[in-house]
């Protein structure tokens, strides 16, 4: 590759229509006071500067109004969750009735699977009871699927199929999934897929997965932890049955921030789902009459259990407003440019250091990935990770030898990629 030119990089940042958004986030700094080059937004996003003020609004309301804060104040807590319907719908490509904020990702995953995974408990070879997922999925998803299967008295060794992804980064990561869906046929109950793979950064072709699964009578659920805020999503148009996500990565809503879930409109009127229910999923009009029998709220709100986690949701509102204002199209365009530039830097580094026996795991096709690049090193991987850390580049380590880097378009700059290049020159 041609060495990145500092003047050209400065001009790119100067002309970047999203460049000003970086000033709306707190910049973490090293012990010497210098700011980090932060490439860990795939693990924890930065804090929007508006968060302390948003929290103060709610703590002031609590202090001054106490229980009356449910019905009074800037954002009455009774309907607090409704603040997120519009932004979340735009974020994931849904109708407002199809999304709701609350809980945490794995809690929502269990709630959704409790409703949508309805396996045939027969032990014959034609029983529809198999869950299909990608191999090497995030462990919480694996544990959740194992326990869902055991909850129905079935054996995960028989009923969970994990599809190995291709080693060749030029290959289509979705192809093995489609082949396995067709092979399982009528035995397949649910495809439960991480839309963007947390380890490799692969972005799967969700419309093709949905088409293949529905063709054999199966449902499709998605874990959007590494997709929401990272890649364009059109859950409603694609026909995805259900999905859930967290908000502390690309959505910048803070550690343990509130999750979200999506239920496609075609399932809203079904009364055969084994949904687990709580009082906040009851219709709002009669909720406080405390009726004995559950009357579901409209759409995804019926899947709520408890009232809004206001102190966690206040930062979420600030972060979503920034993302909503920037727009996914602009974010994706910048993301493609940033990641392509970082990819060239890493490939050049690996070419100059064959002794490391390194390679990029993330697909080479930009349409098959988000912003993250995962670089595996057979030798001295942790040495490189530590070296980058000492030189002000904050990345993410995953055993056995992978460094993940995620230039996030909402707050990273092209100069951050230049800094990586300059640091790698001296390794």
Predicted regions, residues:
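Pyridoxal 5′-phosphate
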Residues: 1-427
